[in-house]
């Protein structure tokens, strides 16, 4: 089933199961079936399913998903390899999300940790070159697995584990790190609409307000909210709603960042569930923004990263466009957030969703 004939692939082992099939596998199959060509402008920005199989172990049957090898955002950001421009990454993620939504799929867990980068030319590298590069830059160690509890049944444990390798080091030695393509990966929490899970497993600080207040299940609009938070984090290099300890604080931070909640929302049950006192309720209903948290800081951060002195009229216009896009993505009311196909046409992204431009 591997049409790309890669010499190096990534394996993802699911937890052991008794019956049924891995949900992530069915989602990846659905995405693949809607892709006529691997270089499709939208489908090229989601992880590629290459193959799948099952293995039986002491804990049951494990489904194994075979995909291309990519670099993760988190390993890239702490390396010496320069990250691609945020605007280009955002446009490519928007293309990937459009492909996902056009397949009637909700990703359900979009954040920077689920951003991958495909390295140009890696599919042309043969196995011998890979082994040479790994041997040259990687020091790996094997560690025995020993239970601290002598009475524990260790039949289901491996006899040893291997330390993770310096993947970015040996991949960078083989490929052009200046040409990276951003994509969306990890579909373990994805689902086909309208089959939303009753208790979605989503990053705490990325919960859309309708989910936080238990007003509406997760949906494509929730992905749009997460996309807005993710773009903000790409710019700031820090989560938009950072240093939050609980749901009450998250709601207060949302209001401080975005203003008042919609008046038509029935919040009596939600406010009681969040254990808000009178001062909290007054603050939230007043909807007073806090200058230290407003969206302006995201646009200003991007402006500082790209501007020349004095700033050109184009840079100022682009900064205003970024602010308007984030303001649209991060609307409290789900139905007020634009669908991803409209986001692709936004002035801040439009030129990058039709051609590969690194600005």
Where do the PLM segments sit?
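Intrinsically disordered, low-complexity regulatory segments of kinases
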Residues: 1-359
